[in-house]
């Protein structure tokens, strides 16, 4: 039998007018897996829809980043359900921390991504104490670029992340 892990970590809960940004929990799996199985949602997140098991593993990785780095992605809750994610992540191959966000398709076009990403952005600047965050956005992802612009980000460069060309948007404090 393996020993118990002694690491503990806290994930704060953030509130906006319409949203709660909080830790992912097991009860989010049905909504999260449906979102990750949607080809339109996954189009700009690697392109391949995820199975239920892959969605569970993604939730585990999201929680693992909180344990390893002390920050990560929040579940975005609206109308009593998990509608997506927003937060700050920093994968090993990323050149700097990224403000990232993604919502399930029924929640598109309602300003929810901007609201969630704005709350995560403010929290990220405070938590990390940094002067900038990146958003790596595929060139065809017009909706995500619009969110970045609304939050005051500026497209500064292009790079390749996990084999995909992306525009490098920069958010400054």
Language model features by range: what are they?
Residues 51-70:
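Active-site rim helix/loop that mediates acceptor-substrate recognition in acyltransferases
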Residues 1-44, 60, 73-173:
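Acyl-donor (CoA/ACP) binding surface of acyl/acetyltransferases
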């Amino acid at each position: 039998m393996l020993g118990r892990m002694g690491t503990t970590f806290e994930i704060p809960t953030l509130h906006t007018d319409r949203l709660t940004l909080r830790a992912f929990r097991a009860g989010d799996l049905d909504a999260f897996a449906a979102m990750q199985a949607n080809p339109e949602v996954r189009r700009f997140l690697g392109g391949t829809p995820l199975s239920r098991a892959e969605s569970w593993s993604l939730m585990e990785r999201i929680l693992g980043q909180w344990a390893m780095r002390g920050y990560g992605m929040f579940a975005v809750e609206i109308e009593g359900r998990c509608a997506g994610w927003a937060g700050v992540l920093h994968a090993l191959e990323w050149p700097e921390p990224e403000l990232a966000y993604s919502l399930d398709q029924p929640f598109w076009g309602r300003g929810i991504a901007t609201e969630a990403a704005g709350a995560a952005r403010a929290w990220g600047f405070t938590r990390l104490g940094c002067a900038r965050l990146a958003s790596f956005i595929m060139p065809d992802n017009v909706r995500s670029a619009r969110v970045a612009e609304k939050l005051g980000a500026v497209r500064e460069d292009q790079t390749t992340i996990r084999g995909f060309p992306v525009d490098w948007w920069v958010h400054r404090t």
